[in-house]
UniProtKB/Swiss-Prot annotation:
Gene3D superfamilies recorded: P-loop containing nucleotide triphosphate hydrolases
InterPro entries in the record: G_ENGB_dom, GTP-bd, GTP-bd_ribosome_bio_YsxC, P-loop_NTPase
GO terms, molecular function: GTP binding; metal ion binding
Species per Swiss-Prot/TrEMBL record: Malacoplasma penetrans (strain HF-2)
Protein name from the UniProt record: Probable GTP-binding protein EngB
A single Gene Ontology CC term: cytosol
Limits of the EngB-type G domain: 18-186
Length: 186
């Protein structure tokens, strides 16, 4: 059963083994923790309606892989020193972690920001295995995604196969996300 392992402030705290890892990265309040709970089918990640609650790299065990929930990027309501700390945690993990096999960028489907686009470009240039998870599909009509999928893919400069639309709230397409993660871990 999936479970929380630990929170890490720096690379000194990371688990030292060779188990494959994926990470979730996204703006504050896009539902990364809720998505982890939906994947686990249990409440293993703390959730909050307040943006910026995840301020460490949180490690979760999912049997064949670990999932790391990184702090949200772009959250403005923190001090400059805290912003620097959060950026350092993200950068250290993204650039130094040898276990990392894929990055899943979580984006709120109703609000794709310039910062999301910039991060997508940066991650695409760094990783072959960079996927987009459009969360909060429950907030949009199904026809919105069907009618706008090609535009969204073009805007994000991603192939359609590298994008999945989900709802952590009502678990729409969670099986498809699990299948994608499984294909990456093999």
């Amino acid at each position: 059963m999936p479970s929380f392992i630990k929170s890490c402030f720096s690379s000194n705290d990371w688990i030292t083994d060779d188990k494959k890892e994926i990470c979730f990265i996204g703006r504050s309040n896009v539902g990364k923790s809720s998505l982890i709970n939906a994947l686990a089918n249990a409440k293993i990640a703390k959730t909050s309606n307040t943006p910026g609650r995840t301020q460490l790299a949180n490690f979760y065990d999912f049997d064949k892989f670990r999932l790391i929930d990184l702090p949200g990027y772009g959250y403005a309501k923190v001090s400059k020193s805290k912003h620097f700390e959060l950026s350092k945690i993200i950068s250290e993990y993204i650039y130094l972690r040898k276990n990392l096999v894929a990055v899943f960028q979580i984006i709120d489907i109703s609000v794709i920001t310039d910062l999301d686009l910039q991060m997508s470009e940066l991650l695409s240039n760094r990783f072959n295995q960079h996927y987009i998870v459009l969360n909060k599909a429950d907030k949009e009509a199904k026809s919105y995604f069907d009618n706008n999928f090609a535009k969204i893919a073009a805007k994000l400069k991603k192939d359609k196969e590298n994008i999945v639309c989900v709802s952590a709230k009502n678990k729409t397409n969670i099986p498809n996300l699990k299948k994608l993660i499984g294909s990456v871990i093999l």
